[in-house]
Amino acid sequence: MTQLWVERTGTRRYIGRSTRGAQVLVGSEDVDGVFTPGELLKIALAACSGMASDQPLARRLGDDYQAVVKVSGAADRDQERYPLIEETMELDLSGLTEDEKERLLVVINRAVELACTVGRTLKSGTTVNLEVVDVGA
């Protein structure tokens, strides 16, 4: 299984890493060139929805179909959580009939509901444990 971690690079700035060599810059909203943790959460959801629906869409629209999944959601700063996250999947469906479009919407929603682990986790909630380890001893 891929290992994930973040390393502190400055005040409220981190770099996220994986054992597969991926990196992402994380920081405060006032820092250019970084994602906030909340933005990464929303991007993970959008990417998961796109990936979960990729094969059904490719079968119906062709392997080279274009898709953009936009995602948004304001934080409730009193509760420090996102009470609502909204996604919009933009596709060119002009080559489909109205019936085909309706069927495709059902297929997309079913694929995302069944295969998007991020969305399923957000909708059901999860347990998070934090352990603090003294590495200086």
UniProtKB/Swiss-Prot annotation:
Pfam families from the UniProt entry: OsmC (PF02566)
GO terms for cellular component: plasma membrane
InterPro entries recorded: KH_dom-like_a/b, OsmC/Ohr_fam, OsmC/Ohrsf
Transmembrane segments: none
Superkingdom of the source species: Bacteria
Name of this protein: Uncharacterized protein Rv2923c
Organism (species): Mycobacterium tuberculosis (strain ATCC 25618 / H37Rv)
